[in-house]
Amino acid sequence: MSTIDTTEKRERGDAALFDAAVLVAAMRAAFAKLAPRHLLRSPVMAVVMGGTVLAAVITASGHSHAGFGWAVTAILFVTVLFGNFAEAIAEARGRGQAASLRRARKDLVARRVETALGGRETRVPAAELRPGDYVMVSEGEFVPADGEIVRGVATINEAAVTGESAPVLREAGTDRSGVIGGTRVLSDEIVFKVTAEPGHSFLDRMIALVEGANRQKTPNEIALTLLLAAMTLTFLIVVASLPAIAGFVGVTLDPLLLIALLVCLIPTTIGGLLPAIGIAGMNRALSANVLAKSGKAVEVAGDVDVLLLDKTGTITYGDRQATAFHPLAGVDRVQLRDAAMLASLADPTPEGKSIVKLARQQGAIAVEAEGGDFIAFTAQTRMSGVDIGGRSIRKGAGDSIVAYVQAQGATVSPELQGRIEEVARGGATPLVVAEGRHVLGVVELSDVVKQGIKEKFAQLRAMGIKTVMITGDNPLTAAAIAAEAGVDDYIAQARPEDKLARIRAEQTGGRLVAMVGDGTNDAPALAQADVGLAMNSGTQAAKEAGNMVDLDSDPAKLLAVVEVGKQQLITRGALTTFSLANDVSKYFAILPALFAAAIPSMAALNVMQLSSPRHAVLAALIFNALIIPALIPLALRGVRFRPSSATALLRRNMMIYGVGGVLLPFAAIKAIDLALVAVLGA
């Protein structure tokens, strides 16, 4: 999916914030969340609700001025509602996204077959399918369950799940063999093996996660909740002790003023917005077409220190094309060309197809390799080829081909290493071709580093994030591309176990690691990584192992995931700073109202020159309530993220949300006081 597509999705999500249906649903849910069981999950809001009930009891019993008492009670009640509304609107947006996914889940009839080869066919409801069952799906039919293709190849429309209208190719025996229930086969026929129980499919998990049914608080969120609870308890003790202290100076305190002071002291702003921030983080990831299996995954993405990035598709465009044949001395160029083409006829990779194309462009005659035994490429052998008519042709990484030839008792000309280095220094990938015991030469495969990727890595470096390029290329090619792209380190001639070893080494050093993978051989590393981004086009094992799935199957999306995680952490930190900072102005509003009558010197604290003690209390409480809905858009969209160092981010946020959090309430409370005077009189 292009950046434009993702941007459009974000814009549609922002517009949905003000959708009438979402607002109405959130308002209803806000009242439903007044249940004690829900309120107790937020210590701050639970105390505000307790203060609301107590204020109502005091007013109803005649122990306070009725008009003032009911006004305080109403404002406190609205404060709780606004906190509930913030969480409800975040959940409502998630349910809206889930509704589109639910439409993809249909009551389907499956064609269950006996074996991977077919056999007797039985039509059964999709709900009766179990892991291990074989199902046949033909052109125009819907895939009834999650599974792995065991026979055939087909183009599949996954728009109902991923939002991407372009069909994708799925094929047995490749890293693109996974199919998702609810998608539609557009061409050909496949047999797949069911891998998920009914109700536990990929689509079911997406719906549950998006709706928030399985959302658990992240470690940082739990820590912040405990901090808010401790602060609330501390302020509760302080306020409870004030009547005794006031008695020594002959002051009788109005209980309503004490309740107002407590509510203004405790961090109600962040207390009301905290659940919404957590839910919004997962929603923002989904807006980028990334399914996070937990809020923790999004949060950890913002804390990663090391990114392991596959070269192909992430750093380069991933479209390596054969551009030249370089025969060794004594080898005819035509001999190398024809051998490379013959070894590539059954190679389904873009590189293999490009070799055939280049050979034909240079005059090679189209041939068929019927009866040949094709040798597939594996991550362990790192070569492929064909055995046909007494000939054994191999193409692959230089060291692999050298080992193959030497295993047959042959020696390799020193010229080969020079050819390999010559191609590699130019940033291309050398692919060595051998026939039998003889090395014929090198095929040059060229790729292009993505535009703007070097600047992106520079931004990551400024944030203290180390980038490591993973590639199967030889060290010289890897070094050339790493220098061009601006990565900090690279692993050349990498195997799947090398990724796992590097992740463990980084984690042993106390660093958090993120990586991308799509194959079954990537599963151990994806599971080990702190952030494992699996490609939706990959195998079921990879998607199960990772804690995130990119529905667009774009390896470069890992960079966007890091930005979403950073934005999540920055948003929570910024709003916490603002919440604590804006309490300062409330002190200057409430404290003079409590003590100025008995202690005239306390009037000096009335720096805002508020009209009366009761107006001061009402103004502070009204601001305290209104600031929650005012900040909901910021909580849901997130604070704007600008790549920079942690020190620069802290300095910027302290100026905007710290200093701003102190100054804004002074002006707002004074404006509310003037409005109260205009409406109610002095």
Curated annotation (Swiss-Prot):
Mg(2+) binds at residues 518, 522. GO terms for molecular function: ATP binding; ATP hydrolysis activity; magnesium ion binding; P-type potassium transmembrane transporter activity. ATP binds at residues 347, 351, 377-384, 395. It catalyses: K(+)(out) + ATP + H2O = K(+)(in) + ADP + phosphate + H(+). Its EC number is 7.2.2.6. The keyword Ubl conjugation does not apply. Keywords: ATP-binding, Cell inner membrane, Cell membrane, Ion transport, Magnesium, Membrane, Metal-binding, Nucleotide-binding, Phosphoprotein, Potassium, Potassium transport, Translocase, Transmembrane, Transmembrane helix, Transport. The active site is at 310 (4-aspartylphosphate intermediate). InterPro entries: ATPase_P-typ_cyto_dom_N (IPR023299), ATPase_P-typ_P_site (IPR018303), ATPase_P-typ_TM_dom_sf (IPR023298), ATPase_P-typ_transduc_dom_A_sf (IPR008250), HAD-like_sf (IPR036412), HAD_sf (IPR023214), P-type_ATPase_bsu_IA (IPR006391), P_typ_ATPase (IPR001757). It is found in: Cell inner membrane. GO terms for cellular component: plasma membrane. The chain crosses the membrane at residues 15-35, 42-62, 66-86, 233-253, 257-277, 588-608, 616-636, 662-682. It is an enzyme of class 7 (translocase). Belongs to the cation transport ATPase (P-type) (TC 3.A.3) family. Type IA subfamily. The system is composed of three essential subunits: KdpA, KdpB and KdpC. This is Potassium-transporting ATPase ATP-binding subunit. It comes from Xanthomonas axonopodis pv. citri (strain 306). The lineage of its organism: Bacteria, Pseudomonadati, Pseudomonadota, Gammaproteobacteria, Lysobacterales.
